[in-house]
Every structure is written in structure tokens, then in C-alpha cells.
Curated annotation (Swiss-Prot):
Single GO MF descriptor: tRNA (guanine(46)-N7)-methyltransferase activity
Protein name: tRNA (guanine-N(7)-)-methyltransferase
Catalyzed reaction equations: guanosine(46) in tRNA + S-adenosyl-L-methionine = N(7)-methylguanosine(46) in tRNA + S-adenosyl-L-homocysteine
Origin species: Bacteroides fragilis (strain YCH46)
Enzyme Commission (EC) number: 2.1.1.33
Keyword Protein transport applies: no
Pfam families linked: Methyltransf_4
Lineage: Bacteria, Pseudomonadati, Bacteroidota, Bacteroidia, Bacteroidales
KW Transferase (keyword) present: yes
NCBIfam families listed in its UniProt record: PRK00121.2-2
Top EC class, one word: transferase
InterPro entries reported for this sequence: SAM-dependent_MTases_sf, tRNA_(Gua-N-7)_MeTrfase_Trmb, tRNA_methyltr_TrmB_bact
Amino acid sequence: MGKNKLEKFADMASYPHVFEYPYSAVDNVPFDMKGKWHKEFFKNDNPIVLELGCGRGEYTVGLGRMFPDKNFIAVDIKGARMWTGATESLQAGMKNVAFLRTNIEIIDRFFAEGEVSEIWLTFSDPQMKKATKRLTSTYFMERYRKFLVSNGIIHLKTDSNFMFTYTKYMIEENGLPVEFITEDLYHSDLVDDILGIKTYYEQQWLDRGLSIKYIKFLLPQEGELREPDIEIELDSYRSYNRSKRSGLQTSK
């Protein structure tokens, strides 16, 4: 029989590679590991890669297995979901994987300048009603700049046409370098082992016949960032709390 939420929370609290710092816990108290992830936790100088909004954490675990020469930190606020990947990585004895339970809105409180090399955004909520909540908005790009190396890599993998289109316009508006972009990942020439890792939710999107979009771009440290001023057609489907809850057809 599977564990209930309380049992999973108890497990998470005991795991040595899990850090739980929701907004209230770090509101006025500095995070001890900030600037010390390499030295005190991973005990190496390998690049640190974040997965923001990791859900169950399968992508982070998959990347950690593929790249033992990189360090991976999965971030989400839902502890019961993260338990899956946290448990799997612990049982596998993976030393290059950690989990951080916190609100992504305060992600810059956990990492020092230049401490992170890459960010993965895997199937993030497109937040169609409010741009500042989108993980590819300039609001979040400015936060990422506080800890990402200059020209650090950002990967967006999404089922949402709205999120893909918005991100594409944001990149164009700010002249950010794009290394690869496709509207249909699994019918492109970039299907490799990394992008072939499929999470629980991704498989459900594929089973419904939705194409998976992917953008890999760089975020320079310099330059003022501007939001794109354009109307984008909203996603029409409903699933996993991603719904078009108003009569609007487009949004900025």
C-alpha cells in the first residue's frame, strides 16, 4: 500500500539531500547553504543545474544518472510530489542530486552570484492570466540573473502553445541567443537521450496527442529586459489545474 501525505512528509524531513524552506521559513533568516552548495553539500566543483517546478522529480533523477559530472537540484513547493524522486535518488545512492522545497518566487535567496550554470523549466504552469507568474517572464529572468552564470543556459520544455509562444516573443524582444527551438520535439532532429527523458505528466500529454515544444536559450547578465507587448491565443484544453477559467481568448 502506498504511503499517505503525512508519511511522505516525515520521510522528506529525514532525507539528507532534501532542504525544506517555504517562504515563511526564509522570510527573515538567511539560507545557510547559499554560496556553499559546491563545498558543503556536493563536495565538488561540478556545474549546478536547477529544475524549477520539478513535480515528482523524475527529470532531475534522469539527468543525474546521465551526467554524474554535474550536480542537480530539483525545486518545487509540493513535498508529497517530490517524495517520488527524492526517494528514488536516495535509494540509488545518488550523490549529485538534491531537492529543495520552496516557493520559486524566492529562488534567488538560495543561490549566490554565479553559483548555477543551467536551469530546466519542465512543463511549467503557463500562468496565462498574469505574465509575472510565468517562469520565463522577465520578472523571473531578473531573478535568475542573480545566481546564473553569464550566458547561462535555460531550457524550456512544454506542452503549452501559449507558454512556448510567449517565451519565443520574450526572447525576440530582448535579443537573447537561441541555441535550438522546435514546436514538435519528437519529430525534430534533436531527439537525444536528454530530451527523451519523459516525466509522468509529459507522457500524459503525448498520449493525448499534444506536441512537445522545446527552446534552449542563453541569458546574458547585461541588458535591460522588456516584456513583449503582444496578444497570444490561450490554450484551449483543461488538465492538471491548467484551465482557461474566463471567457478570454487571448492574453499578454
